[in-house]
């Protein structure tokens, strides 16, 4: 989680248009790029998993897992978590939404799990983070 935590904290993006977070340099295969695009478009879906991602781009779960990890140093689901927390930070900083609303907006059904994941990656609870943005 330390690697994810530092990446979430940096808030660097590859492309603002898609809000893709910074990844290790180097060319990415079409499967990795398609996975990043899929995550950017569907991160709010609480049912997203490696199976739905792999099916959407037409490859096996095993191949997707291998290629994504090799090219990014993250698992696809690890990146999904990272992306969700990145988007949650943006929503919490806006201050228009309550923590439970943000949790649902970024794909978490369980607010407590969202809170513990957020704190693990940012060092602050969602409400502490939001208070600092006011």
Q: What is each model feature region?
A:
Residues 1-14:
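Single conserved hydrophobic/aromatic residue that forms the stacking wall/gate
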Residues 17-24, 36-48, 68-72, 89-98, ...:
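Basic, amphipathic alpha-helical hairpins
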Residues 15-34, 57, 70-78, 82:
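Short, Lys/Arg-enriched, Trp-marked, Pro/Gly-tolerant hinge/linker segments that flank
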Residues 52-59, 64, 68, 102-109, ...:
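Append "Primarily bacterial transcriptional regulators
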Residues 70-109, 131-134:
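Terminal helix-turn-helix DNA-binding modules in bacterial transcription factors
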Residues 116-134:
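…primarily DNA-binding HTH/wHTH and HhH modules…
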């Amino acid at each position: 989680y330390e690697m994810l935590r530092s990446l979430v904290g940096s808030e660097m993006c590859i492309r603002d248009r898609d809000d893709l977070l910074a990844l290790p340099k180097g060319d990415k295969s079409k499967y990795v790029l398609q996975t990043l695009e899929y995550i950017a478009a569907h991160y709010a879906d609480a049912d997203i998993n490696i199976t739905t991602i792999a099916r959407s781009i037409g490859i096996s779960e095993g191949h997707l897992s291998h290629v994504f990890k090799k090219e990014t140093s993250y698992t696809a689901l690890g990146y999904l978590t990272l992306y969700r927390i990145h988007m949650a930070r943006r929503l919490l900083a806006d201050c228009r939404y309550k923590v439970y609303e943000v949790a649902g907006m970024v794909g978490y059904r369980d607010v407590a799990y969202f809170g513990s994941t957020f704190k693990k990656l940012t060092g602050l609870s969602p409400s502490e983070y939001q208070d600092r943005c006011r």
